[in-house]
């Protein structure tokens, strides 16, 4: 997704109490930020914020942290979150390679990874958010029995991710190659998901649990 530079993005981010512009400063302090002891769920690559806004509205008893890289993307998502008036979301700019510098041990109870870049070339596969390189980082801050919910349209990424999860000690609790015909009733449809469905592309989905 290529977006033009938006001059207003960083000032809006810095002015909003919902945006954490220096997330590394909050390691071990996220419960203080939310001012409660509710479980914290993490979305990696939140895009325009549709998913996190909808799920936070549906589950006010949980806290959500949404991460993306570019200010232009964060700012659009921030406006959506702000307009929805949800208070249980914080959004932050971050290169996900540094995600283990943002959360402390047992600080996160669930991770959502929705339609991440599949990086199909062999030399790029270590950039996948489901690669063992990243899963090892997530394990540093996930609570025992935490889950990763992973959705993709890409067959190759999905199949290889199954191996990544198993290699890193996760147990596959649920898996389907066609989410919308699986009977799974806890799905929140994302913007990309809607587009893929219109094209007749099956959505692959799994829940991996950390043991």
From Swiss-Prot:
<dbReference type="InterPro" id="IPR055361">
    <property type="entry name" value="tRNA_methyltr_TrmB_bact"/>
</dbReference>
<dbReference type="Pfam" id="PF02390">
    <property type="entry name" value="Methyltransf_4"/>
</dbReference>
<keyword id="KW-0819">tRNA processing</keyword>
<comment type="similarity">
    <text>Belongs to the class I-like SAM-binding methyltransferase superfamily. TrmB family.</text>
</comment>
<keyword id="KW-0949">S-adenosyl-L-methionine</keyword>
<dbReference type="InterPro" id="IPR029063">
    <property type="entry name" value="SAM-dependent_MTases_sf"/>
</dbReference>
<feature type="binding site">
    <location>
        <position position="43"/>
    </location>
    <ligand>
        <name>S-adenosyl-L-methionine</name>
    </ligand>
</feature>
<keyword id="KW-0489">Methyltransferase</keyword>
<dbReference type="InterPro" id="IPR003358">
    <property type="entry name" value="tRNA_(Gua-N-7)_MeTrfase_Trmb"/>
</dbReference>
<feature type="binding site">
    <location>
        <position position="117"/>
    </location>
    <ligand>
        <name>S-adenosyl-L-methionine</name>
    </ligand>
</feature>
<feature type="binding site">
    <location>
        <position position="121"/>
    </location>
    <ligand>
        <name>substrate</name>
    </ligand>
</feature>
<dbReference type="GO" id="GO:0008176">
    <property type="term" value="F:tRNA (guanine(46)-N7)-methyltransferase activity"/>
</dbReference>
<comment type="function">
    <text>Catalyzes the formation of N(7)-methylguanine at position 46 (m7G46) in tRNA.</text>
</comment>
<protein>
    <recommendedName>
        <fullName>tRNA (guanine-N(7)-)-methyltransferase</fullName>
        <ecNumber>2.1.1.33</ecNumber>
    </recommendedName>
</protein>
<feature type="binding site">
    <location>
        <position position="68"/>
    </location>
    <ligand>
        <name>S-adenosyl-L-methionine</name>
    </ligand>
</feature>
<feature type="binding site">
    <location>
        <position position="153"/>
    </location>
    <ligand>
        <name>substrate</name>
    </ligand>
</feature>
<feature type="binding site">
    <location>
        <begin position="190"/>
        <end position="193"/>
    </location>
    <ligand>
        <name>substrate</name>
    </ligand>
</feature>
<keyword id="KW-0808">Transferase</keyword>
<dbReference type="GO" id="GO:0043527">
    <property type="term" value="C:tRNA methyltransferase complex"/>
</dbReference>
<comment type="pathway">
    <text>tRNA modification; N(7)-methylguanine-tRNA biosynthesis.</text>
</comment>
């Amino acid at each position: 997704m290529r977006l033009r530079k938006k001059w207003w993005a960083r000032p809006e981010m810095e002015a909003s109490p919902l945006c954490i512009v220096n997330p590394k400063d909050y390691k071990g302090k996220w419960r203080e930020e939310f001012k409660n002891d509710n479980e914290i769920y993490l979305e990696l690559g939140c895009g325009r914020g549709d998913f996190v806004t909808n799920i936070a509205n549906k589950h006010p008893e949980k806290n959500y942290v949404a991460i993306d890289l570019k200010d232009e993307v964060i700012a659009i998502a921030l406006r959506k979150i702000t307009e929805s008036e949800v208070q249980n979301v914080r959004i932050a700019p971050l290169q996900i390679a540094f995600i283990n510098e943002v959360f402390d041990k047992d600080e996160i109870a669930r991770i959502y990874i929705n339609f991440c870049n599949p990086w199909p070339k062999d030399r790029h596969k270590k950039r996948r958010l489901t690669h063992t390189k990243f899963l090892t980082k997530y394990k540093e801050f996930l609570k025992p029995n935490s889950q990763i919910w992973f959705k993709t349209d890409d067959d190759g990424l999905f199949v290889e991710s199954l191996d990544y999860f198993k290699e890193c000690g996760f147990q596959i609790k649920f898996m389907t190659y066609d989410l919308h015909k699986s009977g799974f009733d806890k799905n929140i449809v994302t913007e990309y998901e809607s587009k893929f469905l219109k094209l007749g592309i099956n959505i692959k989905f799994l829940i991996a649990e950390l043991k």
